[in-house]
Amino acid sequence: MSLWSSVKFAQRYAQLPKVFYRLVTPQPLDNSRWVIWNGELAQGFALPKHADDPQLLSVFSGAEPFSAFKPLAMKYAGHQFGVYNPDLGDGRGLLLGEMQNQQGQWFDIHLKGAGLTPFSRMGDGRAVLRSTIREYLCSEAMAALGIETTRALGMTVSDTPVYREQVEQGACLIRLAQTHIRFGHFEHFFYTEQYDELRLLADNVIEWYMPECTAHDKPYLAMFEQVVARTATMIAQWQAVGFAHGVMNTDNMSILGQTFDYGPFGFLDDYEPGYICNHSDYQGRYAFDQQPRVALWNLSALAHALSPLVERDDLELALAQYEPTLGKVFSQLMRQKLGLLSQQEGDSELFNAMFTLLAENHTDYTRFFRTLSQLDSEGAQTVIDLFIDRDAARGWLSRYLERVALEQTASGEAKSAQQRCEQMRAVNPKYILRNYLAQQAIDKAQQGDFSEVHTLAKLLKNPYDEQAEMEAYAHLPPEWGKKMVISCSS
């Protein structure tokens, strides 16, 4: 039986007019070999669990032409740090084609680091080992956290030198996503006044990903309303888990509200609302607490690009749903994290007091929620000890426990402390991809040892489980590992 006999492939984007993309032959790296293969994900597409067959490597590294693929570089534009840039496109990644999973969903196959394209501008079309490791680990960690995201099927390393601040090893990521269509695709056709192509793009987004919009009397408006709702939900998830993306340009915003293009990202260590993870973000435009505002700005930019298809008043009404949706989803997530099942008056004040307390005491965000979810077994003092101002912590904890008791009285369903805490542990991760953990894996990998990449990948598949033998990975970061800022260079 052929390696590919059970895999279903398609090339829908390649059927669009040539103005949407350029066909490009991948430029394979020298002596490519696997760093890691995501066997569990692969099986969902009828691919083997283990990457033993050499054809897997040669096809997915771009070294061997494959009849089911039609490699292409997408053309798009975008606002970068608020400034429109018309000269964007896939500069080092190629859309190879699509695969269908066992649930019948189609996923793009994208090879990141595949070489020069017509859109490479001053770049070399390559990706380096460190950034590829970070994207592989984080996209899979986010999926395990239940956050909408692209996925990583595998990654390779090579002997090809790549020149950045220093000479580094070239690597490739095999990224899967339900789509690689970005806000910037629509911006490109709008600003170049290619309105027929703009309409065709919207038609295909609806046909491929949002067929329910066709029943709407204004299908393009229905599409935009979905983008608004999905984006608001994604941002609420980011804020709840403490994830900072770092470079929320419109060309990095997925039309399906999926976390896209992992670059200088970071998870909060100490709760610092103004946390900036991208060292190129001098003004803090993409700081953690600015992400909700920036997402709305980006949606407004998309709305402008859709103005030939949708009435302005309709676009404004759709945009007006962003903040209520974000607030509703975020409040739901916060209640889940605190073990509160019902909505009560005063919840916002309780949340705000908690965030103020966390910020003033520089308390670790993930550790706080995980410790709070162990209140049944560890007791209140373990929570209080996380804070410098223990009296303030004691006061907030008293308010919190009163709120828990109020909910039980109001609902008439008194959950035990153990039941509540078990539910909290299912939504408050013990393990996240802290930047220092990723850096330790990168340091080893650059010496040819990929064991830590595999260890983290396995650990982060089950972030809510105790995994007692992995306890060291739940420790607070060392001083050198706190507030790391990451370069966009990759």
Swiss-Prot record:
Q: What class of enzyme is it?
A: transferase
Keyword Nucleotidyltransferase listed? The answer is yes
Enzyme Commission number, as recorded:
2.7.7.-, 2.7.7.108
InterPro entries from the UniProt entry: SelO
The record's active-site residues are D251 (proton acceptor)
UniProt KW Nucleotidyltransferase keyword:
yes
- Disulfide bond entries: none
Q: Which residues form a coiled coil?
A: none
Give the residues the record marks as binding ATP.
Answer: G89, G91, R92, K112, D124, G125, R175, R182, D261
MF terms from GO for this chain are: AMPylase activity; ATP binding; magnesium ion binding
Record keywords, A-Z: ATP-binding, Magnesium, Manganese, Metal-binding, Nucleotide-binding, Nucleotidyltransferase, Transferase
Report the domain of life of the source organism.
Bacteria
Cofactors demanded by this protein: Mg(2+); Mn(2+)
Chemical reaction(s) catalysed: L-seryl-[protein] + ATP = 3-O-(5'-adenylyl)-L-seryl-[protein] + diphosphate; L-threonyl-[protein] + ATP = 3-O-(5'-adenylyl)-L-threonyl-[protein] + diphosphate; L-tyrosyl-[protein] + ATP = O-(5'-adenylyl)-L-tyrosyl-[protein] + diphosphate; L-histidyl-[protein] + UTP = N(tele)-(5'-uridylyl)-L-histidyl-[protein] + diphosphate
Entry binding sites for Mg(2+): N252, D261
In terms of PANTHER family, this protein maps to: PROTEIN ADENYLYLTRANSFERASE SELO, MITOCHONDRIAL (PTHR32057:SF14)
Q: Briefly state the protein's biological role.
A: Nucleotidyltransferase involved in the post-translational modification of proteins. It can catalyze the addition of adenosine monophosphate (AMP) or uridine monophosphate (UMP) to a protein, resulting in modifications known as AMPylation and UMPylation.
Family per similarity comment: Belongs to the SELO family.
What HAMAP family would the database entry show? YdiU_SelO
Name-wise, this protein is Protein nucleotidyltransferase YdiU
Report which gene this protein is encoded by.
ydiU
